[in-house]
Design a protein with these regions (language model features):
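Acidic (Asp/Glu-rich) sequence patches and key acidic residues
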Residues: 1-92
């Protein structure tokens, strides 16, 4: 499972999203694109901070996809960008 949450969310009140291993495969190409453009890789088994500029790269790559989890992920990214929030990706 790869959990995405707001870095500043100490109370668990802000939006978050869990993506199971079977759905991560849909995001891997976007993660690789982000790595090629920035050197930042979202490791499904580690912890990564995703800053708003990096979030926008992911949105640009994933925009228009119709898989449910991708749509949810893009929605979370757009909210975080609008609120200028850093996301934390925490994998296991």
């Amino acid at each position: 499972v790869l959990d995405f949450s707001y870095l500043a969310d100490s109370r668990g009140n802000k939006p978050s999203l869990s993506i199971h291993d079977r759905d991560i495969k849909f995001l891997e190409p976007a993660f690789l694109d982000l790595e090629q453009k920035t050197g930042i890789y979202i490791d499904p088994y580690g912890t990564t901070r995703i800053y708003p500029a990096h979030q926008q790269i992911l949105v640009d790559y994933l925009q228009g996809r119709s898989e449910d989890k991708i749509v949810e992920f893009v929605r979370l990214l757009k909210n975080a960008i609008r609120e200028d929030e850093v996301l934390v990706a925490d994998g296991d």
